[in-house]
Amino acid sequence: ELARVFSSPDVKTERSIRFALWNNEETGLNGARAYVDQRQSLQGIENPKGSGKYPEPKWLGMIQHDMMMWDHGMPNADGSIPKDQRPEADVNIEFQMKSKATLASQQLAWFLHGSNEKYATDYPAQVGPHMTNTDSAPFQDLIPTVSLRENERGSQVGAGWDPNWHQVSDVFSTYSDKDFRLGLNAAQTTLGALLHLANGSLKKP
């Protein structure tokens, strides 16, 4: 939906925004790693020369949306999963504190946090330094990089908070209206941030 918004003819930005869908995340971030390996050296190269076209723009930052809708809390003592969204549900914004671009990534994370406070209608955001095991990782040493998700990837998803992670249950019918609204708030957070970062504006009719 964000791609649809930014591709509208009445939306103008001073910087390019590229939306990418990665495959094979489960088997080792293969799609994202291949993109970095194959495209990193092509940044900012005009092709064909004199055309004014740059098939691979210079990378300024990477904002990843991972699993975005299930925040029901930790498993119960018997191992069962809470049916309903937890009252403390929030949008997690993670950067990797051990990356070569950690300072710029942290700045980007807090910029998104500010966007959440301004534009998200229902759910707050939390910033954390442990981005891991996600398609933004291949970019983390190159450019400011963050990952938005429903739970902290390491301590919460890794502890079984999301029963739909890499499972066949990750389908539309699994999620409630509240779950979808959490995902919407992540989209609102990123939409607002991108609009400012790319100096976006609406063209007057």
Name each model feature, range by range.
Residues 20, 61-63, 144-148:
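Hydrophobic/aromatic beta-strand patches that form the interior of the parallel beta-sheet core
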Residues 1, 5, 107-115, 138, ...:
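Amphipathic alpha-helical segments that form well-ordered structural scaffolds
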Residues 6, 10, 39, 43, ...:
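A generic secondary-structure signal for well-formed alpha-helical elements
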Residues 8-13, 118-123, 196-205:
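Surface-exposed helix-capping loop/turn segments at secondary-structure junctions
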Residues 22-135:
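Metal-dependent peptidase/peptidase-like ectodomains
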